[in-house]
Amino acid sequence: MILHLSDLHFGTEKPECMWAIQQFCQQHQIEAVVASGDLTQRARYAQFFACKQFLESLKRPYIVVPGNHDIPLYHLWNRVFSPFTRYKLFFDNLENVLETEHFYLVGVNSIRRRYHTRGHISLEQIQRVDEQLKAAPKNKLKLVIAHQPFYTPPNDPHGVKDCPVQGRLALEQWSKHGLNGLLHGHLHVPAAYDLNQIYQLGAAHPVWDIHAGTATSYRLHDNLPNSFNVIDHHMDVRHYFFNAVSQQFEQKP
């Protein structure tokens, strides 16, 4: 199974949540860790360093993608001309692939310097990921990681304004070649939606849009505690929430 973290927002982290995640990894057979963006609060060197140290402490293979908080906000020169310099100093490539016993994980950079919060998936990215999905082992679950969700329900205050430009086009193309799910953060609210049913994609299996809450930050939304997702090799998605009394992450009943 994989541990799906998001919106760590180092610079606003809670040590008790970090410790509880470390304990969880020690106690469970985690194949890999996914961190779906917003690793930092303000893209500072110290924040990237702290995030890197934390992910390394989990002692599991991991894959990360940038979020909108991972490029400079106030330093306009850096935002325009070198938005990912600090990110790449600690995490190298913006887009990676990680293969485990049961999963084939593809990272996609949906962050653009011209947008404050909204994502964007280019035609080149759509084609590249499509080729990767076609080449992926058929016996593994194929998951694509991007920071912004590809779907928000009609009553969501963010609406479609934060969903990536060309996200629907990407979804329709990737679902033709075995996509099982998309992993996101951004909204700080855990959820899972079957896009095969919502959009009538015609896939032979569910295509999940899986949202993670914030795992370690005090920047909580909707009065929800810190949380993360666990996804097993049957594509069963479980949400775990931080219990302030037990100081552990516990599965939602």
Give residue spans per PLM region.
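N-terminal active-site segment of His-dependent metallophosphoesterases
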Residues: 1-57, 73-74
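Active-site neighborhood of phospho(di)ester-bond hydrolases with catalytic His/Asp-centered motifs
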Residues: 4-6, 33-38, 62-68, 109, ...
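Active-site environment of divalent metal-dependent phosphoester hydrolases
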Residues: 11-13, 41-46, 68-76, 113-117, ...
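Charged helix-capping and loop-helix junction motifs
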Residues: 19, 47-51, 122-127, 160-169
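Extended active-site neighborhood of metal-dependent phosphoesterases/phosphodiesterases
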Residues: 49-128, 136, 173-175, 206, ...
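Short acidic, glycine-rich surface-loop motifs adjacent to enzyme active sites
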Residues: 138-155
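Conserved beta-sheet core of the metallophosphoesterase superfamily
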Residues: 159-234
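A short C-terminal boundary segment appended to hydrolase-like catalytic domains
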Residues: 232-253
